[in-house]
Curated annotation (Swiss-Prot):
Required for normal plant growth. May be both photoprotective and play an ancillary role in photosynthesis. May structurally stabilize thylakoids during osmotic and oxidative stress. PANTHER family: PLASTID-LIPID-ASSOCIATED PROTEIN 4, CHLOROPLASTIC-RELATED. InterPro entries: PAP, PAP/fibrillin_dom. Its main location: plastid. The keyword Phosphoprotein does not apply. Belongs to the LIPC family. Keywords: Chloroplast, Membrane, Plastid, Thylakoid, Transit peptide. It is found in: Plastid, Chloroplast thylakoid membrane. It holds the Pfam family PAP_fibrillin. This is Light-induced protein, chloroplastic. Associates with the major light-harvesting antenna complex polypeptides of the PSII oxygen-evolving complex.
Length: 326
């Protein structure tokens, strides 16, 4: 009794408790914490502290100790701060494969060679070495068994075929340049179209051949040409003349000639417009010798390397590939 009397002398606040098992009443019962009837065995081992902090971001901290299965307060609650942001770590950039590096080096080596016409002997040797390395790592060793990869338009980027050099040479084609040489393949109909686009001062035109191909081996196809097509000229933008031109070290003012050149240009434009309305000219190719074969030594979704007669090599890049950009 002496210990209980001393306990009653400790100053404390009154704790209000609402019993969940009692019948509902309009009056809330209160019990002093100093009462001996209140301190049960379970409550004597419980310590509960609730703290409230003043913070720009309010938080509530609850802590429970001596937790057991009968503890109605549950386990310790972690501190929760509102407005948290989840941080996702970015993956490091993927390292390019050896094939991708070789293709990039090849594309860089082809730049400025005019499809092989202007390539020096040193550049040619470098290109041949890169082609050989790519051929040894061909991801599709049986290209004719992956015909869907052949589909689409392929732009000629380089060739060692000397038969195309006169066509590529500007000296043999005054005032005309070769704008594009391409090959379009349709594996469903087994057709191939080779096309050369020429660009002049006022118009562009094209010459193309249509052919059928047959699969002869996992790498080789036989091509037979059937017809040729000469496209009608398509009018381009007007010629923009400079104020002066340099000739033999002297600047010559060409402004007095602009009127004459403009009248000639207008006349030529009217002629080109009348021709452009005409259908293209088609002619059959009946020569039995109009055949060739191609051996595809490298193929992926953006690069194709075939070899032709006499060991000539061609490098073609799929239209839209980043390899076409310098």
């Amino acid at each position: 009794m002496a210990s209980i009397s001393s306990l009653n002398q400790i100053p404390c606040k009154t704790l209000q408790i609402t019993s969940q098992y009692s019948k509902p009443t309009s009056k809330i019962s209160t019990l002093p914490i100093s009462s001996t009837n209140f301190l049960s065995k379970t409550e004597q081992h419980r310590s509960i502290s609730v703290k409230e902090f003043t913070n720009p971001k309010p938080k509530f901290t609850a802590q429970a100790t001596n937790y057991d299965k009968e503890d109605e307060w549950g386990p310790e609650v972690e501190q929760i701060r509102p407005g948290g942001v989840a941080v996702v770590e970015e993956e490091p950039p993927k390292e390019p494969s050896e094939i991708e590096l070789l293709k990039k080096q090849l594309a860089d080596s082809l730049y400025g060679t005019n499809r092989g016409l202007s390539a020096s002997s040193e550049t040619r040797a470098e290109i041949v070495e890169l082609i050989t390395q790519l051929e040894s790592k061909n991801p599709n060793p049986a290209p004719t068994e992956a015909l869907t990869l052949l589909n689409g338009k392929w732009i000629l980027a380089y060739t060692s075929f000397s038969g195309l050099f006169p066509l590529l040479s500007r000296g043999n084609l005054p005032l005309v340049r070769v704008e594009e040489i391409s090959q379009t393949i349709d594996s469903e109909s087994f057709t191939v179209q080779n096309s050369v686009v020429f660009a002049g001062p006022l118009a562009t035109t094209s010459i193309s051949t249509n052919a059928k191909f047959e699969v002869r081996s996992p790498k080789r196809v036989q091509i037979k040409f059937e017809e040729g097509i000469i496209g009608t000229p398509q009018l381009t933008d007007s010629i923009v003349l400079p104020e002066n031109v340099e000739f033999l070290g002297q600047k010559i003012d060409v402004s007095p000639f602009k009127g004459l050149i403009t009248s000639v240009q207008d006349t030529a434009s009217s002629v080109v417009k009348s021709i452009s309305s005409q259908p293209p000219i088609k002619f059959p190719i009946t020569n039995n010798n109009a055949q060739s074969w191609l051996l595809t030594t490298y193929l992926d979704d953006e690069l194709r390397i075939p070899r032709g007669d006499a060991g000539s090599v061609f490098v073609l890049i799929k239209e839209g590939s980043p390899l076409l950009k310098p």
